[in-house]
């Protein structure tokens, strides 16, 4: 750790350390808000690289991607420009869990993002390893020092170090210092953070082998085609690129696969005891799956292309830390892969992280003013989680550098806010992945209305320009007008059209109904209205969907909003000091144990305890109300 005065080679408003998905969003946000920004990366040729699965979106992750775009970020636009395949997951379920997922072209994605950051005003990109922080007399950030001794000044620094901080990759019992295969680990910064009193820990993740597509027999696999109708992450049509899509394929593990793994578990880094870092619960290695789900005869393995012009296939669901000599045998035990050629081995990577309870919800650290952290250093896993934190850290680093109030994203207004609230308030000791179940407000926090929730804020912050703002206003006006039309126009029982709709749907029309009434019926959608000539062809698909969802789910949405309002109203309600939570049978067992251990003072504090979900809070409020009424009744009797 260095102290001022220091001879700075150059001075900036904000320095971002790292150029992955978090670093790029942070640097772009800072620069676009008028701050002279430096983005420091270990490798200028690997900006926005996708070292694991080259994909964007999926359950909860797509909501984050839409939200970053709604604020003015890039990840959604990147996916829309470079996708190989797109599919909507959970399409048969409700809109709260609809999830767009795009397989992306790995090299194209990185090249397009590199071009964007290289041509961004106010943004300087430089290759180098930051190893130390420069602090002022009051322990405030003043800059950074690189491995070779060069110092750069800054009012704010954002750490987005990914898996590089103290990174070690493992294949079997062999290891080497690296942030990912073929790239240096970052050294020095962990020691600086420890010296400043920060707690750091170790986490692990992994990536599967890559296989030559020319050596795979797809006829033995199940094709996974793209959706015919392409959907988009970005709310900006200028980012939409119609392109030919590529299929993915599905194969499965076999008894031979399972036996190979069971016989050699002792050779894996975790089961062999070479490392003891926690890996991601929701993205386990294949050996973890075999151990944890021993009763399963087979596991799905998805075969996904990494690009249009490269032969590499990503073997999703098959990450491992087992020795390289075993990996080819394991791969060749999969149907369609009997003669496959392995181009890159799978490996596990262990790295340092900074538990995010040491951060404010602005992502500025509590110990050092002007120091922010975002992405995997905060204990998360996934490009989307990283990008979401990156744009928040970039916004707030810029605000801090400019002496303005920083922005806090409430959990009830976005998945992004839920993510950061969880990170900053819960003691998480394993890589955190965003899930729809983590949000108690998921019916309100949908992908389709991310712009409605966050674009006005993006405009206020300064990341949404006039063109995007005009697009947003037009869309919202069109949805509002269409909802009014649907609530006004009616179909009569005795009209030929009314009789046809009744016959087709098997549901009678009594006297007359509005078009909104029709939309509220199960399995009746806007496309059905359109088929009867009752739709509005001038609207975009997104505008039609927005109007339909608001009408069809209005009762559920209102109920959830009431729950939000109720919990908000009761946030400061004090909890009885002597309350024995273990006796409150309407609480889940996990909630009883956590509440009894933590002993929160208020309802608001209780909502932020890991393992206590919204249903538990509602049950607790009901319990307190019942106790209050019983107490009043007893007092009335005795008086």
UniProtKB/Swiss-Prot annotation:
Disulfide bonds: none annotated. Its cofactor is FAD. One of its GO terms (cellular component) is cytoplasm. NAD(+) binds at residues 279-293. It is found in: Cytoplasm. FAD binds at residues 18-23. Keywords: Cytoplasm, FAD, Flavoprotein, NAD, tRNA processing. NAD-binding protein involved in the addition of a carboxymethylaminomethyl (cmnm) group at the wobble position (U34) of certain tRNAs, forming tRNA-cmnm(5)s(2)U34. Belongs to the MnmG family. This is tRNA uridine 5-carboxymethylaminomethyl modification enzyme MnmG.
């Amino acid at each position: 750790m260095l102290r001022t005065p220091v001879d700075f080679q150059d001075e900036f408003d904000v320095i971002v350390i790292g150029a992955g998905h978090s670093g790029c969003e942070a640097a772009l946000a800072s620069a676009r808000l008028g701050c002279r920004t430096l983005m420091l990366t270990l490798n200028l040729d690997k900006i926005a690289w996708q070292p694991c699965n080259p994909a964007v979106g999926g359950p909860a992750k797509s909501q984050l991607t839409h939200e970053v775009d709604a604020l003015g970020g890039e990840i959604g636009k990147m996916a829309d420009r470079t996708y190989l395949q797109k599919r909507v997951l959970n399409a048969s379920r409700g809109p709260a869990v609809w999830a767009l997922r795009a397989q992306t072209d790995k090299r194209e994605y990185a090249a397009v993002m590199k071009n964007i950051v290289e041509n961004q005003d106010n943004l300087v990109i430089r290759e180098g390893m930051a190893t130390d922080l420069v602090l002022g007399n009051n322990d405030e950030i003043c800059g950074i020092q690189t491995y070779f001794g060069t110092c750069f000044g800054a009012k704010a620094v954002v750490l987005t170090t990914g898996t590089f901080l103290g990174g070690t990759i493992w294949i079997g019992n062999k290891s080497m210092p690296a942030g990912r295969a073929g790239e240096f680990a970052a050294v020095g910064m962990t020691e600086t953070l420890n010296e400043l009193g920060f707690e750091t820990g170790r986490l692990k993740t992994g990536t599967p082998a890559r296989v030559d597509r020319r050596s795979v027999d797809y006829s033995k696999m199940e094709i996974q085609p793209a959706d015919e109708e392409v959907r988009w992450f970005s709310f900006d049509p200028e980012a939409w690129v119609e392109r030919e899509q590529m299929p993915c394929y599905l194969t499965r593990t076999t008894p031979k696969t399972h036996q190979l793994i069971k016989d050699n578990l002792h050779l894996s880094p975790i089961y062999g005891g070479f490392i003891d870092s926690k890996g991601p619960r929701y993205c386990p290695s294949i050996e973890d799956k075999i151990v944890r789900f021993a009763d399963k005869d087979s596991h799905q393995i998805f075969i996904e292309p990494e690009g249009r012009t490269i032969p590499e296939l990503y073997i999703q669901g098959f990450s491992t830390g087992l020795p390289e000599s075993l990996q080819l045998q394991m791969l060749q035990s999969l149907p369609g892969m009997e003669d496959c050629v392995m181009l890159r081995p799978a490996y596990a990577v262990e790295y340092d992280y900074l538990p995010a309870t040491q951060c404010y919800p602005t992502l500025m650290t509590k110990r050092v003013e002007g120091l922010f952290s975002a992405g995997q250093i905060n204990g998360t896993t996934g490009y989307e989680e990283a990008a979401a934190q990156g744009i928040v850290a970039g916004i707030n680093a810029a605000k801090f550098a400019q002496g303005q109030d920083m922005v806090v994203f409430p959990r009830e207004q976005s998945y992004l806010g839920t993510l950061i609230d969880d990170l900053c308030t819960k003691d998480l000791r394993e890589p955190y992945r965003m899930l729809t179940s983590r949000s108690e407000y998921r019916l309100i926090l949908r992908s389709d209305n991310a712009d409605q929730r966050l674009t006005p804020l993006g405009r206020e912050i300064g990341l949404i320009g006039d063109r995007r703002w005009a697009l947003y206003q037009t869309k919202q006006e069109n949805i509002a007008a269409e909802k009014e039309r649907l609530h006004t126009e009616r179909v009569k029982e005795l009209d030929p059209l009314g009789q046809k709709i009744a016959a087709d749907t098997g549901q009678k029309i009594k006297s007359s109904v509005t078009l909104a009434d029709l939309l509220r019926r199960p399995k009746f959608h806007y496309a059905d209205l359109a088929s009867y000539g009752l739709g509005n062809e001038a609207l975009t698909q997104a505008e039609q969907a927005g109007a339909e969802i608001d009408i069809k789910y209005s009762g559920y949405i209102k109920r959830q909003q009431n729950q939000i309002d109720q919990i908000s109203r009761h946030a400061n309600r004090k909890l009885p000091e002597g309350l024995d939570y273990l006796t409150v049978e309407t609480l889940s067992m996990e909630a009883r144990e956590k509440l009894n251990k933590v002993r929160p003072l208020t309802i608001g504090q209780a909502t932020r305890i890991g393992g206590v979900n919204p249903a538990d809070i509602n049950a607790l409020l009901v319990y307190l109300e019942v106790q209050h009424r019983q107490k009043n009744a007893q007092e009335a009797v005795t008086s």
